[in-house]
């Protein structure tokens, strides 16, 4: 599908092949409007090529959102081209003409919602099963090809002439599954479609949910939550439980089928293939169920159209004499042909109908637009009542004849005839548009033509034309239904635009989120690519460095190997040279030895001359051979030893060289490893930096997504709130119009008698009728007060609640004088009782009857958060589904009258306490001074102090200076006391005499104490001086504190601290630290206690119980760490930080320390008790009994501290506690009590 290009452009060959090039106005004739919806209109037409009856859906793609409309048309055409199934609508083609797409499909008689509209009652279960079976077969075909319909409802389940059930209106369908678009009709939407933008995608199971809602619609004539605003219904569907059948007469198979379709979790919901095997759709039923239903509906449509035609004929015949140039017609009996033609006269367009101005206004939405028309009652008696109401409305509207005639006049030009049910475009020159070659002609009967405008043809000719072709336009839609859809389409354009705008806004939000996510994904990919390139560059550099290092190491190894070989050759040559020298020396020595031995042998032979010469020669030869043999052996031994030595030295040298090479290799490997470690560290640091950068980027992106989602949610909530307010205004206006119409329909006798009300009868007060009977009595409603009642019922309950609180008891009324006083206090003046008396005081109709059809919806929880808690509390009054709204108002005392302003709660509390509110005037009776009585003069005995402050400043300065001097020299303390006493006495009012008396008393006391202590008690003078200084210090401090002379103790302290600087600085530091500890102490103490408890909880259970027995763990600490363990019920008492009441210094009281010591002792006592309990468990029973009788053993009370049991035991205990004991039955309270949700 092309994303760009203007609407209607066929430059793309894939788009151009979807549409035919022919002119549709030349191919199709006899166009008649048979339905209307948000997309446009649906027309009945005939193909001039083969006289085939078709349905044409005209969709305009001009105006606003033209590109979106064009894309929707392309998507629907592509979807229809792929359908090849008997239970889906057959596609004939699509044509373009003047920015309008003509989508040609096969013609069907009507939809399942038309059956409900015609019969005014639900379908039978066997009929619902047949319709559901056909729809399921179509859905199974779609789902097998990964298609989703997404708009399954009774208005889109069509019935054909052969009795086949077909799925239609594929404008919301999706070719690909899964999908995530917000598409469909609100009341039939599945929860996952509503939450698709937030929670993900959905598949074909959404059609199964819509089919379940459609079953409820066919069984109850309307879907659940239909009396609620569409926006509120979306929230209820997503949040509340699944709906179910209300009536109890349906079979268990049907209930199980609906419950299976309406499973809230999509995974638990069966597919269409599985539902085709359900017992509800497979059980036996007559094969002609659909045909019988269609035939019965046709008969009902014929009867309704006959009735409507008789009403129209009566109006035309009554108005005919008043027309210009019209003659009074004479009524005559209708022939059978004309009677059969009556129901189809409106659809054929042969009469200028006034039906458009006489239709009953409906609150429902058109079946082919957004929902089925279900604004009717459920039985045949209600149908008769509605027909009577229609007759009364038509009689009332007879007075508006001229305006109605102007609306029904035929338009000139193309001879377009405007009727209640169709708009027929007749081309000039075509006399008969209804000839059917496949239908026999009927002989027309005589019929008196009604009065018609001059531009129209004769009525008898049109009737004859219709009689010849009455069967070629078979339908199960009444003329009033088609007309009502046309009127609702014109009137409810704002509602459709609102809902389409809401869907468009949701789609735009989804596109915006997808665009944002794609942009952020691109940023992440770019960031990841940049980091990857950086990492690869670093790794490439590391590889280059490693290669250089490897080449260097290789060169070093080769150089060392060559050097080692050269050294080895030198070493071998050196050893070989030495061995050669040794061998040459040996050979020289052997030669010398040989010569010497030869001479010795010769000398020995010469000494023995008797030996023959031959023997001498032989003996000498043997001796020489022996000598040579010994020399050869000695040479061979030397060579062997040299070879061994050579090999040994070579092995040793090679070993030494191998060790050196190994050491070198180790050094090189260590260098290589160090280099690789450095590179890995740098790479790890780079990866950490990249990870941190990636984390920051993802965090920023998540924040951007969350901000966008929050903004889009805020806009969505604002839009929904605005739509709800508009819905309230629209319903209020409709209710006012309905009330006005009902008041106009009242008999004139009642209106006349309303003005003749006796004077003795009571009238309506400001807050309700003064003569209040029982709440169930019918209270008349005047036309002048309709706005007040409607406004009270439709949106201003929050003002009635304070009114009821003011009145006290519900339903009480006020006297006229009280009403006048309240009106003056609140700023509103109630009118006189005569003004509240209306013409409808004796009307005999009940408001509760009209309120049964109009229910004001209750808001969802999200909308309550938007509107506020006060408005949400007021809206809760509308959630009474089965009650009567007006009866509730009468019971609560909410009747017509001016709305009182609520009294603030603060003023009520003040009045209850008996005190006057702030701002009220006081009189002399309350203790206030009167302006007539002069104020009393001040008493004369009081001394008038001089205005000069110089003496006081001098005395304070003198005392401060003396105090500073006393701090450095403690011997001046008595002098300071002696000066302080007369100064304070002089300031007290005694003057100089009092000062002298105080000085004398001080000196006498000092002298007397000295005489008594030093003379009588023989106290040392030094000790007396120290005692006098201490007494004087205490006296000075007490007197200065009593008189407020803060300079004295401050001077003493400053001088003392300056005299001892080594002590002053630590004291200042301790003071600062104490202040910080005092501020941060509770928080630190809580943190340390929590840390201590966490450390204890990580220990084994045995150790924890031991510490718990020692008093190391208390209830308070555990409850502070685990607040929910101290709950008493289903709610947790979470600790809330609150300032402690009382003196914070009480925590350091000695009693607190004693309490802690007592807790530790108690813990050790508990430990001893446990040990004694274990010891007692080992004793025999008689010994335990004796110890218990002596008082040494006592029973043990269970502790409130939770035990740390294993998880398996806790689960077993929880499951065992939830199970009831065998043989017990749960009480009524436990059965009826609703399970509370877990505390969050």
Swiss-Prot record:
The EC number(s) this enzyme carries: 2.7.11.1
Molecular-function annotations in GO: ATP binding; mitogen-activated protein kinase kinase binding; neuropilin binding; protein serine kinase activity; protein serine/threonine kinase activity
Keyword terms: ATP-binding, Cell projection, Coiled coil, Cytoplasm, Cytoplasmic vesicle, Cytoskeleton, Kinase, Magnesium, Membrane, Methylation, Nucleotide-binding, Phosphoprotein, Serine/threonine-protein kinase, Transferase, Transmembrane, Transmembrane helix
Positions of the Protein kinase domain: 28-281
Any single GO CC term annotated in Swiss-Prot or TrEMBL for this entry: cytosol
Residue ranges of the TM segments: 972-992, 994-1014, 1019-1039, 1045-1065, 1175-1195
Listed Pfam families: Pkinase
Biased composition (Pro residues): 931-940
Basic and acidic residues: compositionally biased ranges: 402-417
Keyword Ribosomal protein on entry: no
Compositional bias annotation for Acidic residues: 381-401, 904-914
Catalytic activity line of the entry: L-seryl-[protein] + ATP = O-phospho-L-seryl-[protein] + ADP + H(+); L-threonyl-[protein] + ATP = O-phospho-L-threonyl-[protein] + ADP + H(+)
Coiled-coil ranges per UniProt: 493-528, 581-608, 688-720, 805-934
Positions bound to ATP: 34-42, 57
Cofactor(s) essential for the protein: Mg(2+)
Annotated localization: Cytoplasmic vesicle membrane; Cytoplasm, Cytoskeleton
Known role: Serine/threonine-protein kinase involved in different processes such as membrane blebbing and apoptotic bodies formation DNA damage response and MAPK14/p38 MAPK stress-activated MAPK cascade. Phosphorylates itself, MBP, activated MAPK8, MAP2K3, MAP2K6 and tubulins. Activates the MAPK14/p38 MAPK signaling pathway through the specific activation and phosphorylation of the upstream MAP2K3 and MAP2K6 kinases.
Protein name (database record): Serine/threonine-protein kinase TAO2
Organism: Mus musculus (Mouse)
